[in-house]
């Protein structure tokens, strides 16, 4: 609801929302807003009377967004497709790709920013819930918020190819994750 209102207030060109796997389940009818574990934790969505409004809104969300040399996506892209990723990636990969991939994407000079898989799992550190950068092509931003209470905030300067983690104390350039 908040994201919908933010888009109404500031415009869909400034507030970008992407379709994710839970949203896709609601749109295709395999789940409802009130019984979907992500939405069920939000009291205001326990009333199914507004479901049509949310379903229509979710149906309008794009699968990815590109700004500069950065692809923003819920889960990932078909990396074997290289620079043909936009045409070769299936909808289920955009929304449900698993496991997360790391390393250089051959044939594609772009970065991918994705969520879906928790950074604790990607890093192999159950206590890591910050932004994960593999040092090559991937930034993962799923801090497993329902377990950790952490919502990592990423600021991207696409003109200068700089990626920052934003916290209450300011912004910090993201360095590759080190074990």
Task: List the model feature ranges, each with a label.
Residues 1-68, 79, 96-103:
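Active-site neighborhood of divalent metal-dependent phosphoester bond hydrolases
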Residues 15-16, 69, 111, 137:
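The start of beta-strands in P-loop NTPase/AAA+ ATPase cores
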Residues 21-22, 74, 113-118:
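Histidine-centered divalent metal-coordination motifs
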Residues 31-36, 76-94, 128-129:
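Short, surface-exposed, charged loop/turn segments at secondary-structure junctions
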Residues 66, 72-74, 153-157:
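Short, well-ordered beta-strand micro-motif
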Residues 70-76, 139-141:
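Active-site-proximal beta-strand elements of phosphoester/diester hydrolases
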Residues 102-179:
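Acidic, His/Gly-rich catalytic cores of divalent-metal-dependent hydrolytic chemistry
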């Amino acid at each position: 609801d908040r994201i919908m209102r933010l888009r109404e207030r500031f415009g869909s060109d400034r507030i970008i929302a992407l379709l994710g796997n839970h949203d896709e389940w609601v749109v295709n009818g395999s789940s409802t807003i009130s019984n979907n574990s992500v939405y069920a934790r939000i009291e205001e969505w326990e009333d199914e009377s507004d479901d049509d409004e949310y379903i229509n809104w979710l149906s309008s969300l794009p699968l990815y967004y590109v700004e500069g040399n950065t692809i923003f996506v819920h889960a990932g892209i078909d990396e074997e497709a290289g620079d043909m990723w936009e045409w070769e990636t299936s909808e289920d990969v955009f929304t449900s790709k698993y496991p997360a991939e790391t390393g250089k994407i051959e044939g594609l000079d772009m970065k991918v920013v994705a969520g879906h898989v928790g950074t604790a799992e990607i890093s192999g550190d159950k206590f890591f819930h910050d932004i994960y950068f593999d040092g090559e092509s991937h930034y993962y931003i799923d801090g497993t918020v329902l377990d950790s209470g952490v919502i990592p905030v990423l600021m991207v300067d696409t003109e200068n190819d700089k990626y920052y983690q934003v916290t209450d104390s300011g912004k910090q350039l993201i360095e590759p994750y080190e074990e």
